[in-house]
Amino acid sequence: MNQHMKNDEFAVLYRTNSQSRAIEDALRKKNIDYKIYGGISFYQRKEIKDLLSYLRMLINPNVEEALKRIINYPAWGIGATTIDKLTIAANHYNKSIFKIIKNLDKIDLKINSGTKNKLQNFLNMILRFQIDAQKLNAFEIADLVVKQTQLVKDLEKDGTPEAVSKVENVQEL
């Protein structure tokens, strides 16, 4: 078996989606490109992207993609119209959406007081997480984010086997 074979001549089969993370991590560690057929990559699953977006916000709150993903998940009552207004203001003032939220009292966005309170609560939560992240390790801060945002509770409310799988994915991460 001294033949040198190309990576695209190999396949890795696994029985359950929960096994994909270990395989993906090993391949990533070795810088081996891979494709998932018939399933979704562990890191492409919605619940994983949501949690990673929260964690990205702790490192860099100006990442628009992460902020837009989590600003209303779980449901904070911040709708698409509000997000559009924030995006327009961010473009107008050449600031990030996060900076617009931080300076909401200085900008007239025609947002009602209830929505302003929800945005303030969201901002305060992210700022608290950033402070906590300074003294906690990665596992502890991820656990805190999951508990305080009630991500798992939101996933569990479906009560379906898919919901159980999603909760397991979050716990795996």
PLM region spans:
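Conserved motor-region signature of P-loop NTPase helicases/translocases
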Residues: 1-68, 155-165
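Proline-centered turn/helix-capping motifs that create local helix->coil transitions or kinks
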Residues: 91-98, 134-138
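Phosphate/pyrophosphate-binding and catalytic-coupling "lid/hinge/switch" segments at subdomain interfaces
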Residues: 41, 75-76
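C-terminal helical "lid" of AAA+/P-loop NTPase domains
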Residues: 84-89
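Accessory C-terminal helicase-associated subdomains
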Residues: 74, 104-173
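Coupling/hinge elements of helicase-like and P-loop NTPase modules
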Residues: 1-9, 94-106
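A short secondary-structure junction motif
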Residues: 58, 93, 97, 148-152
